[in-house]
Amino acid sequence: MADGEEPEKKRRRIEELLAEKMAVDGGCGDTGDWEGRWNHVKKFLERSGPFTHPDFEPSTESLQFLLDTCKVLVIGAGGLGCELLKNLALSGFRQIHVIDMDTIDVSNLNRQFLFRPKDVGRPKAEVAAEFLNDRVPNCNVVPHFNKIQDFNDTFYRQFHIIVCGLDSIIARRWINGMLISLLNYEDGVLDPSSIVPLIDGGTEGFKGNARVILPGMTACIECTLELYPPQVNFPMCTIASMPRLPEHCIEYVRMLQWPKEQPFGDGVPLDGDDPEHIQWIFQKSIERASQYNIRGVTYRLTQGVVKRIIPAVASTNAVIAAVCATEVFKIATSAYIPLNNYLVFNDVDGLYTYTFEAERKENCPACSQLPQNIQFSPSAKLQEVLDYLTNSASLQMKSPAITATLEGKNRTLYLQSVTSIEERTRPNLSKTLKELGLVDGQELAVADVTTPQTVLFKLHFT
């Protein structure tokens, strides 16, 4: 038999053995459940123990809810997402949706084990769903090759639990805002049935974290925004005149030489996924590094700097995904008390974990339900307000659009996401708040890419 036929022969043999096992054990027809398949889960759900929830009553209903009803959304099908999907599918979750806007790159294959070389270039969500649907009997994984912003509140409301394996703080903040917008209040009291729990995991090298967020009840992403480190940027003066690191050379080529030379035609943007673009940046970076006797510029480093790649270690992904999947299981079954509410993991020097309770901020712009108070002089310019919204550690907005109600009409003071409106409202940035007609106690509505909700600010003059 040819070597190419050997894997197919093994696959058929495995299917035959599985069919024989189901027949011997008393298989359940076309349901895909053979006797003993869920014994490992039943041990947690059909008997009590010292760590079970005080209100938990062992029964078969929890397992049936897991198998037949519970619907989970996984956001991200990368290194963490692959581990999450595998863990959830093997834990009994059968109604799984996965969202990912990326396609598979060769560099993903060393740790994102649901993908194979033949899958390079295909959407991660679709390939991950195909793999699990084929490998795990009766598991139904529905892929969405989209951005999370492509879906409305009706889509997110259908899920019992949402778990994230993202590498983007903006995306985290957006889904956090979406889940908060789903909350219902009656006479100021939160309706618990409107809560969609969010389990969030993140990794960087040998470090990671996992957290449980119950929107409206526990600290949300915005409550602890200061915990996220700012993106590493190098001073332009250093990049241009005094480079000392390989990264300085790469950033110089990316930020200055590429726009100036436009090597692939006028207006062609740099694409971090295009090997030709990366190769050009790599060669030019080597040339600049040689001028300053700097060593260490490699193709891989070039790609990492251009794409802002976060270093990934497979074992860290496995640990954090296991924590997240365990929390999903605990919340879905109510068998155990969930994490309260933030866990950090460090595997740099030995093994270290620490759990603490992140506290809600009374004036959180996302979950407090209160307008945010800001103080400025009447002579302050609108540009100063814009700078505050983008530079404040507790806000960190990216492209805020500011509107206000003036003389009974809703007026856009500044909006930069639409070119024509940005040009029309740009002169407002140099005007004072008094010149714009704003008064003490004025409410400003601010929209931003970091949240699907409009954030209200109350302006107080000093």
Swiss-Prot record:
Instruction: Please name the top-level EC class of this enzyme.
Output: ligase
Which key words tag this protein in UniProt? Acetylation, ATP-binding, Cell cycle, Ligase, Nucleotide-binding, Ubl conjugation pathway
Name the catalytic site residues. 237
Q: Which residues get modified to N-acetylalanine?
A: 2
Tell me what organism the protein belongs to. Answer: Mus musculus
What else does the entry mention about this protein? Arg-211 acts as a selectivity gate, preventing misactivation of ubiquitin by this NEDD8-specific E1 complex.
**Gene coding for it:** Uba3
Q: Which GO terms describe its cellular component?
A: nucleus; protein-containing complex
Which pathway, per its entry? Protein modification; protein neddylation
State the SMART domains in the record. E2_bind (SM01181)
Record-given protein name: NEDD8-activating enzyme E1 catalytic subunit
Question: What is the annotated role of this protein in its UniProt record?
Answer: Catalytic subunit of the dimeric UBA3-NAE1 E1 enzyme. E1 activates NEDD8 by first adenylating its C-terminal glycine residue with ATP, thereafter linking this residue to the side chain of the catalytic cysteine, yielding a NEDD8-UBA3 thioester and free AMP. E1 finally transfers NEDD8 to the catalytic cysteine of UBE2M. Down-regulates steroid receptor activity. Necessary for cell cycle progression.
